[in-house]
Amino acid sequence: MTATPPAPPRRCFVDEAGDATLFGARGRVLVGEPGCSRFFMLGALEVRDPVALATDLTALRLQLLADPYFKDVPSMQPARRKTAIAFHAKDDLPEVRREVFRVLLQHDVQFHAVVRDKQRVLDYVRARNALDERYRYQPNELYDTLVARLFKNRLHLGPELEVCFASRGKADRSAALRQALQTARARFEAKWQRHVEARIEARQAAAAHEPALQAADYFLWALQRHYELGESRFVQLIWPKVGVVQAVDETAVAPYGAYYTKKKPLVAVTSGLG
């Protein structure tokens, strides 16, 4: 009798949009000021075949770099270290973004995200400071809590999970990120009284070296455009690839926030690239 081969590990690629900063010099509140994002969001893109995705994205980038149409575009010049090195939705031309989205929608991927309203986070920080004047908010605190939220209900879905986080600055935060994943495991087990046996690995990588992180960036960019600018056509485009978007601070209906899924879309979903 032939043994059943083990299930392949689930592979997730995690990036952020916006920033977790609340304060500037001398404690000045930055939320609401120009240049400071109103929302901070963390997203995980689960990719069935990261090698195939990397192959297609790399081939697309080389094809675009060889296209005379983009010859003199600043972001396509290697010295600028932008699109010539890696796709990054914020820096890429609209024509480039269209082609990247076209490739992403052809792959077996699923996107999950958690969104925080930084004004509500600021309210929490102020309330906590009123109770404990020694408390000092750190941006990594918000990031790590969102990691735990993002993976709380996803760690039990397979025997092995590999999570690649986009590098943030020069510090190696692999240990802190592993701890955040363990927090997610503990919260799931406490809530459901069920042990999670999955083996979990966490690592960091630069997006330039991991095309799947570039893909995650594109999904987050689409979500960010909706929340920050009210521009929803990109999130409509990617919605067939979305699992769940949790808007923690949308508490008008339920205290735990709002969950958007295929059955309950964030906005009316349309199909096609338009």
Where would I find each of the regions flagged by the language model?
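Phosphate-ester processing/binding pockets and catalytic centers
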Residues: 1-274
